[in-house]
Amino acid sequence: MVKKIYMKSALITGGLGFIGSELAKSLLKKKIVNKCIILDNFGSFISPLKSNFKDYRQQRLENVKNIIIERGDANNQQITLKLLQKYKPKFIYHTAALPLAKIENLNAKEASIGSVDATRNILESLVFVKNNRRNYNFKRFVYFSSSMIYGDFKTKIVNETSSANPKEIYGTMKLAGEVITKGLSNYYNIPYTIIRPSAVYGPKDMNQRVSQIFINKAINGSNINVHGKTERLDFTYIDDLVNGVILASTRKNGINNTFNITNGKGRSLFEFVSILKKHFPKIKFTIKNRDKFRPKRGTLSIKKATKLIGYKPKTTLEKGIYKYLKFLKVI
């Protein structure tokens, strides 16, 4: 009798997105799992009528083996139950949400669907399947939060115990998702990890984050509006984030813990433009007032992640911008 081989798989909600797709490739490359199930609603959050940005969704997972793509919403219990019962994933990475704060701030209901409703639904679906399936050795539920949950930084550097006081819808919904993750996971005895990233950038991003906007305007010779010369963000290269997420979700010290997974060094928007100027000497920019509705941010401490899971980002902003430009074949 041939012994049935069970695949070790991961379910990634929002897996066609910038972060989810890179995570899927890395999980397979590092052989953490041998199959990734992608649950994505195929939504695009940029207007095809206005956008000058390339749609990278097809290219993100092109020619990647052992990927199964399922179309659907993470808040649909019928879909999540079907996928959990069929594949029994060891890991669930919940990245599905509106990708930008400015989009969520205009769509409170949609914002709550990804961070609140979907989080609750996934955890409840997981509990149902675990209770009705023998030998389901589930490893970790990973919730993707945001540095926006801190609101205005009260200090130059914030750590995971700093007060959470969001000042807009995006941060509020992300924090609500954290509370749901902790509450339901503790009640149902589900091992979880919460990730707080910041200003993620890198190749194949297409959702008009500030880094992408600045780079595209530099390439096109358009004027860059810098809203707040000293405005600081903890820019995090996509490879570093993905590496940190995998460490946090596979190390024992990551169980039932929250981590800032960033570069660990705040850099100003003016510094970002100055780095671009080295590659594009004729770059044009205008300094404008900062957006008063955006929280004042800076550096997120990564000491906890370094100590507990061995996280060490490798990509400086200078190196990350260079790699991004090289991908775009403009240098």
What is each of the regions a protein language model found here?
Residues 19, 79, 111, 173, ...:
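Hydrophobic alpha-helical packing elements
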Residues 45-49, 151-152, 203-204, 268-269, ...:
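A short beta-to-alpha transition loop/helix N-cap that caps and shapes the active-site region
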Residues 53, 155-156, 167, 179-233, ...:
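NAD(P)-dependent short-chain dehydrogenase/reductase
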Residues 75, 106, 114-117, 161, ...:
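Residue-level signal for the nucleotide or nucleotide-sugar donor/cofactor binding architecture
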Residues 102-105, 150, 164, 201, ...:
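Nucleotide phosphate-binding site architecture
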